[in-house]
Amino acid sequence: MVTSAQALKKYGDPTLENNMVVWDVPTELEVGVIPKKLYCNKDMVAPLSAAFKNLIDTGYVKELKTFDGCFNIRKKRGLTSMSLHSWGIAIDVNAAWNQLNMTPTLSAGFVKCFTDANFEWGGTWERKDGMHFQLKSI
């Protein structure tokens, strides 16, 4: 699992936004609720491209109801460490149905579309975060 300490070491102070880009999502990867332009870490572009392609190719894209954020400088809810959203290397989807510490509702096939694209899913953690996908490695 990527930690905030690792992200800080690799990317530096998140408030400087040194590694952030505006990704113009290619037309063939446009997925309904995802913004056409996404502000994220440059290291998210290839994995997100792969995940979106997987969702489209497998038909699991129909399960994507909401996009609930990528870049947001903040601490993890209820904790003192910084969220990986602070460096734009995490994405939340379908948040209303996958609240923190609740049983996740995302299908295994949907999750696999992301985990096959170098993402780790928060739905398997002890402190379940079923809306959350973050880079598996940086």
Question: What residue spans do the PLM features occupy?
Answer:
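Active-site acidic/histidine clusters and adjacent loop/turn architecture
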Residues: 1-64
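Detector for Asparagine
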Residues: 18-19, 41, 54, 72, ...
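Active-site-adjacent loop/helix surface patches within enzyme catalytic domains
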Residues: 49-89
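Catalytic cores and adjacent binding grooves of peptidoglycan-active enzymes
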Residues: 78-138
